[in-house]
Swiss-Prot record:
<dbReference type="InterPro" id="IPR020554">
    <property type="entry name" value="UPF0021_CS"/>
</dbReference>
<dbReference type="InterPro" id="IPR000541">
    <property type="entry name" value="Ncs6/Tuc1/Ctu1"/>
</dbReference>
<keyword id="KW-0694">RNA-binding</keyword>
<dbReference type="GO" id="GO:0016779">
    <property type="term" value="F:nucleotidyltransferase activity"/>
</dbReference>
<dbReference type="Pfam" id="PF16503">
    <property type="entry name" value="zn-ribbon_14"/>
</dbReference>
<dbReference type="GO" id="GO:0002098">
    <property type="term" value="P:tRNA wobble uridine modification"/>
</dbReference>
<dbReference type="InterPro" id="IPR035107">
    <property type="entry name" value="tRNA_thiolation_TtcA_Ctu1"/>
</dbReference>
<dbReference type="GO" id="GO:0002143">
    <property type="term" value="P:tRNA wobble position uridine thiolation"/>
</dbReference>
<comment type="function">
    <text>Plays a central role in 2-thiolation of mcm(5)S(2)U at tRNA wobble positions of tRNA(Lys), tRNA(Glu) and tRNA(Gln). Directly binds tRNAs and probably acts by catalyzing adenylation of tRNAs, an intermediate required for 2-thiolation. It is unclear whether it acts as a sulfurtransferase that transfers sulfur from thiocarboxylated urm1 onto the uridine of tRNAs at wobble position.</text>
</comment>
<dbReference type="Pfam" id="PF01171">
    <property type="entry name" value="ATP_bind_3"/>
</dbReference>
<keyword id="KW-0820">tRNA-binding</keyword>
<protein>
    <recommendedName>
        <fullName>Cytoplasmic tRNA 2-thiolation protein 1</fullName>
        <ecNumber>2.7.7.-</ecNumber>
    </recommendedName>
</protein>
<dbReference type="GO" id="GO:0032447">
    <property type="term" value="P:protein urmylation"/>
</dbReference>
<dbReference type="GO" id="GO:0000049">
    <property type="term" value="F:tRNA binding"/>
</dbReference>
<dbReference type="GO" id="GO:0005739">
    <property type="term" value="C:mitochondrion"/>
</dbReference>
<comment type="similarity">
    <text>Belongs to the TtcA family. CTU1/NCS6/ATPBD3 subfamily.</text>
</comment>
<dbReference type="InterPro" id="IPR011063">
    <property type="entry name" value="TilS/TtcA_N"/>
</dbReference>
């Protein structure tokens, strides 16, 4: 006998929510899914009327669902937001060029303006070119740093007040695990924040912070949303993949593990004696940075000098001496070659 929707008790249930275990029909699931995101937005006071909000759009399921739901809620509850799709072209053949076609279709479907910024125009390099230089081991370091800055630069071009991204509950729980394993205190404290960037960068918020990835997939499937599902060709080597596998194993045993990990990260406190990085600005490009040179400028300098490992890992003492173009002794030259090769 078909199971009836536990909400309306009228229509046949088509799914069992991974997050709550409730059996729901499509319409009740859509409403519950959207209302939970609305409640997150309202309780965290993410937006204010009249703000220009950039939606980080990659063409993937998360950003596509985010764009769709933001448009729905903006109209349903009269948020009064000016929504804009903001995409980054990393220059990955066979992946980003195809996904950007999806973003362009989303632009037409949702009737939202679209701005695309590229690594090539901003940095003079594509990810394909970078991978040829650095190999597959550290490519995600470059992409993560450049992508974050590219979104901010695109937002500045458009006068955007806030950027919202499609980071979901699974993503945040994975990040908590990664930062805990790396002992990264600064990131461990702020990775669960629903809004970041109060130090001077354009604020970023995560409306999908408490939304399970499985439910995002179900929403996109039943809504028949147009999204790109191919994984980045360079990501299988990413460190995040190990945290993801571990998280999925935990979720299989205890479905609430995802939210539990997020709440654990939120409740972690940092000892007052621990020195936290002080945010300033990069002396070269003006971007927010806790060092005299931002990470993007250090990475770019290494690429342009033919020393791609220059900005990888903790900064060597010689890095800034090289970047400031100070002469090196023979001993320093030998040490530098050992570090960057």
């Amino acid at each position: 006998m078909p199971v009836k929707c536990s909400s309306c008790e009228e229509w046949r249930a088509v799914l069992r929510r991974p997050k709550t275990g409730h059996s729901l029909c499509k319409d009740c699931f859509f409403y519950a899914f959207e209302e939970e995101i609305h409640n997150t937005i309202v309780s965290a006071k993410l937006f204010h009327p009249g703000e220009k909000v950039g939606i980080g759009a990659s063409g993937g399921k998360d950003s596509t669902v985010l764009a769709h739901v933001m448009k729905v809620l903006n109209e349903r509850y009269a948020y009064g937001l000016d929504l804009i799709l903001l995409s980054v072209d990393e220059g990955i053949s066979g992946y980003r060029d195809d996904s950007l076609q999806t973003v362009k279709r989303n632009q037409q479907q949702y009737e939202l303006p679209l701005k695309i910024v590229s690594y090539l125009e901003l940095y003079g390099w594509t990810m394909d070119q970078i991978v040829k230089q650095v190999g597959l081991k550290n490519n995600c370091t470059f992409c993560g740093v450049f992508r974050r800055q590219a979104l901010d630069r695109g937002a500045m071009m458009l006068g955007i007040n806030k950027i919202c991204t499609g980071h979901n509950a699974d993503d945040i729980a994975e990040t908590v695990l990664m930062n805990f394993l790396r002992g990264d205190i600064a990131r461990l404290r702020r990775c669960t924040a629903i809004t970041t960037g109060s130090e001077g960068a354009i604020p970023r918020c995560k409306p999908l912070k408490y939304t399970y990835e499985k439910e995002i997939v179900l929403y996109a499937y039943f809504k028949k949303l147009d999204y790109f599902s191919t994984e980045c060709i360079y990501s299988p080597n990413a460190y995040r993949g190990h945290a993801r596998v571990f998280l999925k194993d935990l979720e299989a045993i205890r479905p609430s593990s995802i939210i539990d990990i997020i709440h654990s990260g939120e409740n972690l406190s940092v000892n007052e004696d621990v020195r936290m990085p002080v945010q300033g600005t990069c002396t070269r490009c003006g971007y927010i940075s806790s060092q005299s040179l931002c990470k993007a400028c250090v990475l770019l300098e290494g690429l342009n000098r033919g020393l791609p490992k220059l900005g990888i890992g903790k900064h060597h003492k010689l890095h800034h001496k090289l970047l400031s173009q100070e002469p090196l002794s023979e001993q320093e030259e030998r040490k530098l070659r050992a570090v960057v090769h």
